[in-house]
């Protein structure tokens, strides 16, 4: 009772969240969320969507990380998806392929990986971008890549059923040449 907590005292409270004891960085209705932080990070885009929908969520300035819990991640995604469905039902100009776009957090990637992506797709940017700017640029490009989902899934299922991969194909073709 000298102001220091002992190991016995710490067992009385709620269990410590996993991964370095980080909890969600959001404040909901003036109360800090106590759920364990997941791997989703609080970005400017998420902050913008929260303010547009007038949700009672804010970031706790006292924490040193930007990770949010899975509950809030799913909650924010569901609010965003409801809005997209409403615009497409009302006859809005929303294309069919953008209704169920999953959120991909490219900020989790390393800077070298983001640069390699930028170089591969020859994305034009100004020099000296920091990681956040680079991730945002790559994310915008990534969302606009057209994908033939049916063809991709059909090919994937075929490859799984035939127990082959591209590496198997390369080794088979090299054996035939010899």
Swiss-Prot record:
Phenotype seen when the gene is deleted: Morpholino knockdown causes defects in embryonic heart morphogenesis and pericardiac edema, with defects in heart function that are visible already at 3 dpf. In addition, erythrocytes appear pale due to decreased hemoglobin content.
Intrachain disulfide bonds: 24-25, 33-69
GO cellular component: histone deacetylase complex; nucleolus
Coiled-coil intervals, chain numbering: none
Chief place where the protein resides: nucleus
Family membership: Belongs to the SAP30 family.
Domain comment, as recorded: The zinc-finger domain mediates direct interaction with DNA and phosphoinositol phosphates (phosphoinositol 3-phosphate, phosphoinositol 4-phosphate and phosphoinositol 5-phosphate). In vitro oxydation causes reversible disulfide bond formation between Cys residues in the zinc-finger domain and reversible loss of zinc ion binding.
GO biological process: heart looping; negative regulation of transcription by RNA polymerase II; regulation of DNA-templated transcription
Tissues where this protein is expressed: Detected in embryos at 2dpf (at protein level). Widely expressed during embryogenesis and in adults.
Keywords in alphabetical order: Disulfide bond, DNA-binding, Lipid-binding, Metal-binding, Nucleus, Repressor, Transcription, Transcription regulation, Zinc, Zinc-finger
Function, as annotated: Functions as a transcription repressor, probably via its interaction with histone deacetylase complexes. Required for normal expression of numerous target genes. Involved in the functional recruitment of the class 1 Sin3-histone deacetylase complex (HDAC) to the nucleolus. Binds DNA, apparently without sequence-specificity, and bends bound double-stranded DNA. Binds phosphoinositol phosphates (phosphoinositol 3-phosphate, phosphoinositol 4-phosphate and phosphoinositol 5-phosphate) via the same basic sequence motif that mediates DNA binding and nuclear import.
Protein name (record): Histone deacetylase complex subunit SAP30L
One Pfam family per UniProt: SAP30_Sin3_bdg
Superkingdom of the source species: Eukaryota
Nuclear localization signal (NLS) (motif): residue ranges: 81-86
Zn finger intervals (Atypical): 24-72
InterPro entries xrefs: His_deAcase_SAP30/SAP30L, SAP30_C_sf, SAP30_Sin3-bd, SAP30_zn-finger
């Amino acid at each position: 009772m000298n102001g220091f907590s002992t190991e016995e005292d710490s067992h009385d409270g709620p269990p410590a969240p996993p991964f370095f004891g980080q909890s969600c960085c959001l404040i909901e209705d003036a109360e800090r969320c106590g759920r364990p932080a997941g791997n989703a990070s609080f970005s400017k885009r998420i902050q913008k969507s929260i303010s547009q929908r007038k949700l009672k969520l804010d970031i706790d300035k006292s924490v040193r990380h930007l990770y949010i819990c899975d509950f809030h991640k799913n909650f924010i995604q569901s609010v965003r998806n409801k809005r997209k469905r409403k615009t497409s039902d009302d006859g809005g100009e929303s294309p069919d392929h953008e209704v169920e776009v999953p959120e991909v957090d490219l900020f989790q990637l390393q800077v070298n990986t983001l640069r390699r992506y930028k170089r591969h797709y020859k994305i034009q940017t100004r020099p000296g971008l920091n990681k956040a700017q680079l991730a945002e640029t790559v994310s915008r490009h990534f969302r606009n890549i057209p994908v033939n989902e049916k063809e991709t899934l059909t090919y994937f299922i075929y490859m799984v059923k035939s127990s082959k991969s591209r590496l198997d194909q390369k080794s088979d073709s090299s054996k035939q040449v010899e």
